[in-house]
A protein has these predicted regions:
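Alpha-helix capping and helix-loop boundary segments enriched in small/acidic/polar residues
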Residues: 21, 25, 50, 101, ...
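Catalytic-loop motifs flanking and including active-site residues across diverse enzymes
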Residues: 106, 139, 212-215
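Aromatic/hydrophobic pocket-lining residues that form π-stacking "cages" and hydrophobic walls in ligand
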Residues: 30, 170, 216
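Enzyme catalytic cores with a strong preference for nitrogen-chemistry domains
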Residues: 1-129, 145, 149, 181
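ATP-dependent adenylation/pyrophosphate-handling site
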Residues: 11, 124-130, 134-171
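Active-site adenylate/phosphate-handling loop in enzymes that bind or generate adenylated species
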Residues: 3-6, 147, 177, 197-220
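A conserved beta-strand->alpha-helix junction
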Residues: 76-83, 151-156, 160-201, 209
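Short acidic, glycine/serine/threonine-rich loops at helix termini
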Residues: 21-24, 53-56, 137-142, 156, ...
Length: 220
């Protein structure tokens, strides 16, 4: 029906949350719609974190032949201008922001979600355990990118099984991202529990994690 109206532009406003690979799906859908209505399509998308959702922005314009005419950056607010020539058969290509690579895209989505969640809930900092492993290193880097290293509080909680290498890596990480750093050995607490409970196997391993959780919550 819109194709019969001879419209100049189809405008669609969206609050479409981020999913990996979704930008290509949106573009494919917009290309089909622009061809159906025989008019360029402007796809506007919300940007920012809201609770457990992240909106990635990346608004764009496509022509009737599927040409990408304009694209805003992902994961940031942006003001851009696109000139629509209603007398032209096809539009001129404007500014097209580069797409991040897949790993950078997911990382940036996590950082934006954390940053906006903290801001909207008036949280002042991030407190987390630093084991010296890749898991906590990645989360700490995200936190530093979201709120600044000076607002990140890293806690090393070594046990009798922790290697010197792991301890050194945790300290190096905190220094590299500019985070606060403290050491809280869990061996005395672990020994106290074991003297009473005499746990073995998985139960003993889980005890270390529970002790570390209590320490992080206490700091938080």
């Amino acid at each position: 029906e819109l194709a019969k109206e001879n419209i100049d532009l189809l405008l669609t406003m969206n609050g479409s949350p981020y999913e990996e690979g979704k930008t290509d799906t949106r573009l494919d859908l917009a290309v089909r719609r622009a061809a159906e209505v025989n008019a360029p399509m402007l796809y506007l998308n919300q940007v920012g974190g809201q609770d457990d959702l992240v909106f990635d922005g990346g608004s764009f314009v496509v022509d009737t032949d599927g040409t990408l005419l304009e694209r805003s950056p992902m994961f940031m607010e942006d003001l851009s201008f696109f000139d629509l020539d209603t007398s032209a058969e096809h539009q001129k290509v404007g500014t097209i922001a580069a797409k991040p690579d897949p790993d950078e895209e997911v990382y940036t989505a996590c950082v934006l979600g954390l940053k906006d969640y903290m801001a909207k809930n008036h949280f002042k900092g991030v407190c987390l355990g630093l084991s010296g492993g890749i898991d906590s290193a990645l989360v700490a880097a995200m936190a530093a990118d979201a709120v600044g290293g000076e607002n990140v509080y890293g806690i090393s909680m070594p046990s009798m099984y922790s290697s010197d290498g792991s301890k050194d890596d945790a300290a190096d990480l905190a220094r590299n991202i500019g985070a606060h750093y403290d050491i809280q050995p869990i061996e005395p607490l672990f020994v106290s529990f074991q003297n009473q409970l005499e746990l073995e196997g998985v139960a003993a391993e889980n005890l270390q994690a529970r002790i570390r959780g209590v320490i992080v919550m206490a700091y938080s």
